[in-house]
Amino acid sequence: MIGTGGHGHTYPGATVPFGMVQLSPDTRIDGSWDGCSGYHHDDSVIYGFSHTHLNGTGCTDYGDIMLMPTMGEPNFDPKEYGSKFSHSNEKATAGFYSVKLDKHNIDVNLTTSTRVGFHQYVFNNAGQANIILDLNHRDKLLEGEVRIIDQKRIWVKRRSEAWAKDQYVFALIEFDKPFEISKVKCNGEKGRRFTGTELALSFTRKVKKGEKILVKVTLSPTGFEGAENNSSEIKGWDFNKVKKEAEQLWDKQLSKIEITETDKDKLAIFYTALYHTMVQPNIAQDIDGKYRGRDNKVHDGEGFDYYSVFSLWDTFRAAHPLYTLIEKKRTADFINTFLKQYEQGGRLPVWELASNETDCMIGYHSVSVMADAMAKGITGFDYEKAFAAAKHSAMLDHLGLDAYKRQGFISMDDEHESVSKTLEYAYDDWCIAQMAQILNKKEDYEYFMKRSQSWKNIFDWETGFMRPKKNGGWDKPFDPREINNNYTEGNSWQYSFFVPQDIPGMIEAYGGNDKFEAKLDEMFNSESKTTGREQVDVTGLIGQYAHGNEPSHHMAYLYNYIGKPEKTTDKVHYILNNFYKNTPDGLIGNEDCGQMSAWYVLSSMGIYSVTPGKAEWIESKATFDKIKVNFENGESELLSKNSVKNRLGISMTKYNWIKPKLSESLTPVPVIYAESKSFKNKMGFVFDSFNKDTEYFYSINNKEFEKLDIGLVLNETSTIKFYSDNGYGKVSDTVSATFFKKPNNYTIDIKSTYNPQYHAGGKEGLIDGINGSTNWRKGDWQGYQSQDFEAIVDLQNVKEVSSFSSTFLQDQRSWILMPTKVEYYSSTDNINFILITSVENDVDPKKDENTIKDFSFKASKPINARYIKVKAYNFGRLPEWHIGYHDKGEAFIFIDEITIK
């Protein structure tokens, strides 16, 4: 049950290795974050047993084809058909789950094959037994269908929307005894065929005390015929036989790594971790090879197994490197799946789920998986096609890639999470370069090697942190502990060491081994407190290291690169011993589809892949006396606590890094230093760079470039383009910055307090004449939570004014709602204010699309005023329909520009 409590988000039900079916109880139907797997150990009510579940994700989905046994009069209200249960009557082992439903005294036993879920219900009381099929369980039902074949067999179709926007599941449900339909909820066709977006049926029969009823549910992603064919996996009704076969599959699978250990807790932690790495990705094709592609069409099998559920932002780090050791064939199948998704969906997967691209998280980390496999000599897929697909992902123009290609980094002006995206794109580009090198593609190799050094463009040599840039300069104020929209689920501490492709270059940028060691020490020894946005994923803090989320996972191993392996071992063992427990809350963060557990498996073995794409394992000290790795080819290798040795068929800790050649090297872009993005009369600026010998060249408003000898002064709105020359014929990419001369000399006194994450450049940002876009994550909006907004604009002298406007943004999914109303007041002395007007909001708070609204008023005749007060009333507590209601969430006001004429 490790990970079923706390924030682990694992499920306890039955499945087989990499199986299509995950048959597990559901205790959460509210879409809550800690209920992403459908189950949480703190709960006391089971609502049903569904056949698909996600292991440790941070988004909710699945829960398909839910069945629930009850007794008495059937009811379709989950609160009525749900049943209390006790953990003392619950058992979960590999391939088997059982529980007693207290409400009607029913014993439930579950097991599976790859594509079939097998239920055994024991009704301990005589009477009317029901099996509820509720297709509205958890996800939004787009299209439901139930076809009655006979009293023992039905076909089911469930097309649903949640995280995956258009998911298809087909099922064949078989009962070992005939049932009658006793109740129906249906808003569509009725008869032998039931359809609709509200669909539930109750199947009923009389039972004797102690009577067993068996149910088989076969899944298919392609159609009813696929489900019929897949049902051949389980012939007959011998539940114990199927349970034993599932257990045998797990025995074989888990014996791929054998450890010698007497501590039962450590054994349970290790093998549960190994188990968690093997419950996904999931086979997503029928027994005859047919599968549903990313184009939503059904395709014939092509000689490999097609899979789904690729949490690549997480799993490229440790789970997929682990698979290269013990799942070489599946690794090739995963990659062949990637390539089919590229062919049928237009690009490689980012976070694929049930033939849907969710576009969750960042990077194009499928290239890491492919490069790692190629580096380690894994075959069974087309290297040339893999390279073409990888290059395609890197050359797209979305998600900040256009700016990244143009200027060598992503700015806040271009895209949110700009720092994280720049760093992860750079690593992925290095992976593509390694693929090009294997295929002797010299030009591609040099191009992507140069791109892989783009991390240098966001590294601040003064502070030693990866920092966001805005308008060509460093964004400020800057706090490396602050979690904000410039980083993906983290802060600068947790991203400033992510240069796995160029660790020697990173160490050099920090000032050498000693300074790099000091920086690592500072991270681990800092106060374990973050600032800015509350981020539920950032857990397991050691200083600012956060083991509960993936960006930190390689950091403890960086001491190895500066000759301090004892510090690596110390940190790794602390994490192993403190953040993994044999308890339901035994994971310090989300399991994340096996990544959290893969870190444990590899680290406890004394190895880790810091740089996937490089045929190299980094050592630490193993925690077990003996570790035997059994490979697919029948060979095995023995590792020991004292020494891993070079027995895994690839190099160990050689650090054979090759410094980029001049043709591959990158000259970092210069940084522009200016007081702000806007100015009243004139503004000066200067350039700076890590290399103090760099020369700078600039162009103002598309004039010829010229060398900068001294600082410049602007006195009108201007766009500056600039680059640096390192003196050896290597120039940087060209960066542009635009500075605006303000349309007036107004000043503003903001009475409210904005959230530091959403400062929009400070108070002057509200009267600078620059309007924000609907992508508020770029940082152009000021945010105020749990308070009204109030500010006074000083026009500097009494003027005739007749036009008043203030601009607000709504993104209700992010708790940003329009103010209920905006009031405008006038004054000549800043003491006595007269209400001019009140503008009511007319934007529906339930509207999903990001929306901008000007709360404007035009007076019928001019008003004499020097001071204009603007007051916007906060929406307040999030309403009951809102996803943040259960968190007692308070709405934000987002404002950008106040205009007075």
Positions of PLM-derived features:
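Accessory carbohydrate-recognition regions in carbohydrate-active enzymes
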Residues: 1-320, 324-368, 374-423, 431-457, ...
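Aromatic, loop-rich ligand-recognition surfaces of beta-strand-rich domains
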Residues: 773-837, 851-901
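Extracellular Ig-like/FN3 beta-sandwich strand-entry sites
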Residues: 212, 715-719, 865
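Solvent-exposed serine/threonine-rich low-complexity stretches and specific carbohydrate-binding patches
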Residues: 835-845
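Short, compositionally stereotyped local motifs that mark structural "simplifiers"
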Residues: 656-783, 787-789
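Exposed aromatic-hydrophobic patches
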Residues: 202-204, 708-713, 852-860
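Short proline/glycine-enriched turn/loop motifs at strand-loop junctions of beta-rich domains
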Residues: 125-127, 689-695, 798-801, 819
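Beta-strand-rich extracellular modules
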Residues: 220, 723-727, 873-875
